[in-house]
From Swiss-Prot:
Listed name of the protein: Argininosuccinate lyase
SUPFAM superfamilies: L-aspartase-like
Enzyme Commission identifier(s): 4.3.2.1
UniProt gene name: argH
Pathway involvement of the protein, from the record: Amino-acid biosynthesis; L-arginine biosynthesis; L-arginine from L-ornithine and carbamoyl phosphate: step 3/3
Subcellular location: Cytoplasm
GO MF term set: argininosuccinate lyase activity
Protein family: Belongs to the lyase 1 family. Argininosuccinate lyase subfamily.
Alphabetized Pfam families for the sequence: ASL_C2 (PF14698), Lyase_1 (PF00206)
Reaction catalyzed: 2-(N(omega)-L-arginino)succinate = fumarate + L-arginine
GO biological process: arginine biosynthetic process via ornithine; L-arginine biosynthetic process
CDD domains, A to Z: Argininosuccinate_lyase
GO terms for cellular component: cytosol
Alphabetized UniProt keyword annotations: Amino-acid biosynthesis, Arginine biosynthesis, Cytoplasm, Lyase
Length: 466
């Protein structure tokens, strides 16, 4: 038996190997809702344009609604013999209402159908991601507000550099997620043109109304070029690029969580409900959620690479290679949402060990930059001169195995005679962070303002999650 939807010019059916490599229903059934929405909009347009009768349109739409209920209740049987979600639905519709079902495919192709389905699916996914990122940002704000003046070491090269506040550090991730969300919003606007009605690649001779379909499905407009419409997968590439940047941000935070809960840091304690144990070492409490976020980052990166390689050599318009766009897309979206949820759960169940953070912030001469700044302001040295002198003072402290503020004024004056006792006022971690009042700096007063701005941002973007 040849394929009932395209077998007219064939004398034999596909063999089992061809069916196996050709089918996509095992994964594109995830698009059933979008495919039915697209078909209903297309059917309404055909009725409006008098290409099919109103009665035929009613039969088709009712049948599609029944099929959707069957799928959602688990009573629909998908068949690999029918290749994909489009043909499974159309064949089921034909069994339900007869040959009238075949009229649904008038003036369209699976090429423009799948492109429309995918755009609808990505729009829905962007809203889900907006919801999850909004929640994660809210969690970061809450912790930052509780620890706007909690002092911790800031790092460069993973070496203690300068004291900062935990609130300021967490607000850095808030800003990263803001950029992530803006990328999703930009993608939504850029991709919101409707391919439906482009047919296989050249458009159609039927008097269709593409603007109606676009409006019915919530698009801003139809696509401008029918060849581009069916061969474009930029929106998938951009989605996966955005996903890669977003998971990279989560991976950086996950790495810090892994470090911070380790014995050598002890900055935080993770809750038992978001950690795991060891099958051999009874004492272990492992940050597996953070490690899995870090690990899944490579998986999402590879999804982006996958689709870029699929698309790089394809001539216009459609090629079957493009069937390979869906699995990496679905996998990346599913794992990114899971990672955002896991990160939110970790942060909501975290204990901050403030004393350990402060102790660490006071180590390794973290206020040396404050000393250099003081020499510039009060001794009228150039920064390069003060940098050299501060380096000598650090070397002296190392030699004496003490902190800078534990050196005596006499010891300091042997290096720079004009230094005064006032210098000790800038050598504490607390005074260091309090002094960093430049816009965007770590001073607690700045952090409170950043948190206030963050709350306004969340209020203004709440509608994007609806």
């Amino acid at each position: 038996m040849t394929n009932p939807l395209w077998g007219g010019r064939f004398t034999t059916s596909s063999n089992d190997i061809m069916k196996k490599i050709n089918e996509s229903i095992s994964f594109d059934q995830a698009l059933y809702e979008e495919d039915i929405l697209t078909s209903i909009a297309h059917c309404k347009m055909l009725v409006n344009q008098k290409i099919i009768s109103k009665y035929e349109g009613q039969l088709i739409i009712h049948g599609l609604e029944v099929i959707q209920k069957q799928i959602e209740s688990g009573n629909f049987e998908f068949s690999t013999d029918l290749e994909d979600i489009h043909m499974n639905i159309e064949y089921s519709l034909k069994k339900m209402i007869g040959n009238i079902a075949g009229k649904l495919h008038t003036a369209r192709s699976r090429n423009d159908q799948i492109a429309t389905d995918l755009k609808l699916w990505i729009r829905k996914s962007i809203k889900k991601l907006e919801q999850q990122l909004h929640k994660l940002q809210s969690t970061l704000l809450n912790i930052a507000e509780n620890h706007y003046d909690t002092i911790m070491p800031g790092f460069t090269h993973l070496q203690i550099a300068q004291p900062v506040t935990l609130g300021h550090h967490l607000m850095a991730y808030f800003e990263m997620l803001k950029r992530d969300r803006s990328r999703w919003q930009d993608l939504y606007k850029r991709m919101n043109q409707c391919p439906a009605g482009s047919a296989a690649l050249a458009g159609t001779s039927f008097p269709i109304d593409r603007h109606f379909i676009a409006q019915e499905l919530g698009f801003d407009s139809p696509t401008e070029n029918s060849i581009d419409a069916v061969s474009d997968r930029d929106y998938i590439i951009e989605f996966l690029s955005n996903a890669s940047i977003c998971i990279m941000h989560l991976s950086r935070l996950a790495e810090e969580i892994i470090l911070w809960c380790s014995y050598n840091f002890k900055f935080i304690t993770l809750s038992d409900n978001i950690t795991t144990g060891s099958s051999i070492m009874p004492q272990k409490k492992n940050p597996d959620a953070a490690e899995l976020i870090r690990g899944k980052t490579g998986r999402i990166f590879s999804s982006l690479n996958h689709i870029l390689i699929v698309m790089k050599g394809l001539p216009l318009a459609y090629s079957k290679d493009m069937q390979e766009d869906k699995e990496p897309l679905f996998d990346a979206e599913r794992n990114l949402i899971l990672c955002i949820e896991a990160m939110n759960s970790m942060l909501n169940n975290i204990t901050i060990n403030s004393e350990n953070m402060l102790k660490a912030a006071e180590h390794d001469y973290s206020t040396a930059t404050d000393l250099a700044d003081w020499l510039v302001k009060h001794i009228n040295l150039s920064f390069r001169e003060s940098h050299e002198i501060t380096g000598q003072i650090v070397k002296l402290a190392e030699h004496n195995k003490c902190k800078i503020h534990e050196l005596t004024l006499i010891q300091l004056q042997k290096i720079i005679p004009s230094i005064t006792e006032d210098v000790f006022s800038v050598l504490s971690a607390k005074n260091s962070v309090t002094s960093r009042t430049s816009y965007g700096g770590t001073a607690p007063i700045n952090v409170l303002q950043a948190i206030k701005n963050g709350r306004i941002y969340l209020e203004n973007t709440d509608s994007l999650t609806q």
